[in-house]
């Protein structure tokens, strides 16, 4: 009975955590499902001849492709590779968000900041590089056809880098503010600029050549410039959004020290015992 009760409590804790994640990060979760579904639907309709995929791609005559080109792909392997990368990037970003909420005192406020940063990075990492490409194509008269979800993927990787890097200046400010209070605006600027600096140092540690190869350098069909721009957009947007959102937050280890309480184990145990007591 003891082992059975522990298993039931563990399951209840997981259910409770899933509820909290859904409540706070439903936008992230919905985007991680809806974008791949839209890409698969467009590819299927294109194969069936119902919809011509190029009609949604970015060309000089289709400015709506600045947004819609993200769900258009050039065949199964292009679609599969981008969906795999997008799912992996989204999971990494969500994991970084959840780790951050554990280490930040006001986890609800942190979650709202994360959702805003994710939404901005998702939209702008697709729109800004595509807008630059569209303007250049119209100005030069060149025929350009661009499509794919890869810019969003690299935008999310930039957001991931800034999310991880922002914890370091937040920890430093938390230590400093035990003695002196730092105003909100300088605090936000310090967090944002420090996260950009740390992310840049991380890239140098990895190696700039290796970074460019990861962005597709050497592949004839890869839009390396767009990938770089998307990564930078995600990095900067993430740093700015997190800097302002964390401007009143403090780092804490209290939740880790009271892990059982943070996970709601006792509440889960009470719920399980109540359910068992109602069973005939």
Residue ranges and their predicted role:
Residues 28-121, 129-143, 211-222:
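N-terminal TM1-TM2 helical hairpin plus the immediately adjacent luminal interfacial "cap"
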Residues 27-28, 53-61, 157, 162-165, ...:
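Hydrophobic alpha-helical transmembrane segments
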Residues 142-166, 226:
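Membrane-interface micro-motifs in multi-pass membrane enzymes
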Residues 110-118, 122, 145-148, 152, ...:
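Internal alpha-helical transmembrane segments of multi-pass membrane proteins
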């Amino acid at each position: 009975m003891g082992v059975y009760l522990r298993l039931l409590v563990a399951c209840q804790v997981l259910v409770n955590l899933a509820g909290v994640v859904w409540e706070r990060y439903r936008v992230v979760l919905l985007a991680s499902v809806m974008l791949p579904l839209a890409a698969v639907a467009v590819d299927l309709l294109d194969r069936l001849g119902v919809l011509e995929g190029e009609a949604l791609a970015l060309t000089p005559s289709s400015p709506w492709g600045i947004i819609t080109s993200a769900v258009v792909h050039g065949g199964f392997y292009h679609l599969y590779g981008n969906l795999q990368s997008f799912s992996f990037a989204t999971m990494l970003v969500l994991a970084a968000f959840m780790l951050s909420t554990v280490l930040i005192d006001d986890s609800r406020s942190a979650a709202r900041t994360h959702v805003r940063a994710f939404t901005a990075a998702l939209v702008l990492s697709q729109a800004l590089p595509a807008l630059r490409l569209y303007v250049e194509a119209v100005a030069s008269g060149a025929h350009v056809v661009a499509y794919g979800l890869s810019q969003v993927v690299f935008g999310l990787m930039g957001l991931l880098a800034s999310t991880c890097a922002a914890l370091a200046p937040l920890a430093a400010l938390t230590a400093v503010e035990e003695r002196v209070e730092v105003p909100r605006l300088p605090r936000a600027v310090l967090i944002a600029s420090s996260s950009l600096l740390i992310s840049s140092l991380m890239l140098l540690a990895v190696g700039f050549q290796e970074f460019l190869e990861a962005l597709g350098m050497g592949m004839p069909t890869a839009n390396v410039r767009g990938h770089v721009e998307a990564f930078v957009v995600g990095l900067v947007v993430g740093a700015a959004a997190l800097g302002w959102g964390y401007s009143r937050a403090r780092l804490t280890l209290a939740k880790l020290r009271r892990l059982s309480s943070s996970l709601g184990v006792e509440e889960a145990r009470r719920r399980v015992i109540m359910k068992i007591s109602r069973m005939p």
